[in-house]
Design a protein with these regions (language model features):
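Post-HExxH zinc-binding segment in Zn-dependent metallohydrolases
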Residues: 127-159
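N-terminal mature-domain "stem" immediately C-terminal to a signal peptide or N-terminal signal-anchor/transmembrane
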Residues: 10-64, 240-242, 246, 250, ...
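Long, well-structured alpha-helical subdomains associated
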Residues: 146-277, 281-283
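Classical Sec-dependent N-terminal signal peptides that target proteins to the secretory pathway
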Residues: 1-11
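Second-shell loop/turn segments in exported
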Residues: 92-102, 122-131
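Active-site scaffold of zinc-dependent metalloenzymes
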Residues: 55-100, 117
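Active-site recognition of the HExxH zinc-binding catalytic motif
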Residues: 105-121, 134, 138
Length: 291
């Protein structure tokens, strides 16, 4: 099902998840929206609207999977909690990234969680960890963007958003899907992504080739990111986690270039001991502005 701009403006919508459907409800009309669920599904969800709102909190969206022959789950959207921009402090300067199409991208990410369950049900994935859920959901977002937007721009926006989130706080490391998105973006052109008729076809091709970060690696990246972007006064340790700096540099370069421009991004990386004067600054960002 292709969701039009008009459809996205309403507070209730059914969307396809394979052979099943998911109900999309906005929090502003949650109670009447939930009435569209059969009792067998409703009983799998929190008992009342206030409890659902409490679980959602300040998030812009949330998905709840259910066990049913025709319904895959419930997606809650809170448009007023979706950010229009993100800002981060880089060496004393506040820089910002405007976020576009957040309603669609957020919805596609939440749908991606249900699609991840489908991959497991089909046997394509044996086990789903919480981190796998997040990067699979972002891979679905990327595939959906290619199919409907015919552009890599919104995928790069999601990539940059994930980086800025961890720059702001490593509490969001569970959603840092950049190590996977970077592989997807380097492996496939826009036309190649479009050529995959289904998400499962894309993942059947991508999964055997993915290099998945181990939990220990993610913990080390988290520590290095915290030290690099913390606004606290910390003891200078220029060689801290030096073995992780080349990979982190490659993950951050596109976002830093988007925020600062190429020359300033290169200067910042040198300042942070992630780039030396003899290193080549390889990441050109023309593909980020592709619309």
């Amino acid at each position: 099902m292709i969701l039009s701009a008009l459809a996205l403006s309403v507070s209730l919508l059914w969307t396809d998840i394979g052979s099943k459907q998911a109900l999309i409800c906005e929090v502003s009309s949650l109670q009447p929206c939930l009435h569209h669920l059969p009792s067998s599904v409703r009983h799998q969800l929190p008992a009342n609207v206030s409890e659902l709102n409490q679980i959602l909190g300040q998030r812009g969206a949330m998905v709840m999977a259910v066990e049913d022959s025709t319904i895959a789950g419930l997606i809650l959207l809170s448009p007023e909690n979706l950010p229009g921009s993100l800002s981060v402090n880089l060496s004393g300067s506040i820089v910002s990234l405007n976020l576009e199409n957040q309603h669609e991208l957020t919805l596609w990410h939440e749908m991606g969680h249900l699609e991840a369950n489908r991959l497991q049900d089909s046997g394509l994935i044996d086990e789903l960890t919480p981190y796998m859920h997040e990067w699979l959901a972002d891979c679905y977002l990327a595939w959906r963007v290619a199919q409907e937007k015919r552009s890599l721009g919104p995928i790069w926006q999601q990539y940059n958003r994930r980086n800025i989130d961890v720059m702001q706080s490593v509490d969001t490391m569970s959603h840092w899907t950049v190590p996977i998105l970077s592989q997807l973006l380097s492996r496939y052109s826009l036309q190649e992504l479009i050529a995959f008729e289904t998400f499962s076809e894309l993942m059947s091709d991508l999964l055997p080739q993915l290099e998945l970060p181990a939990p220990d690696s993610l913990a080390e990246f988290s520590s290095l990111i915290h030290r690099t972007f913390s606004t606290e006064v910390l003891q200078p340790l220029p060689n801290y986690m030096s073995w992780r700096k080349p990979a982190l540099r490659s993950y951050l370069e596109p976002t830093l270039t988007k925020l600062l421009g190429e020359e300033a991004a290169e200067h910042w990386l040198i300042e942070q001991k992630m780039l030396t004067g003899n290193d080549v600054f390889p990441m050109k960002m023309s593909h980020q502005v592709e619309l």
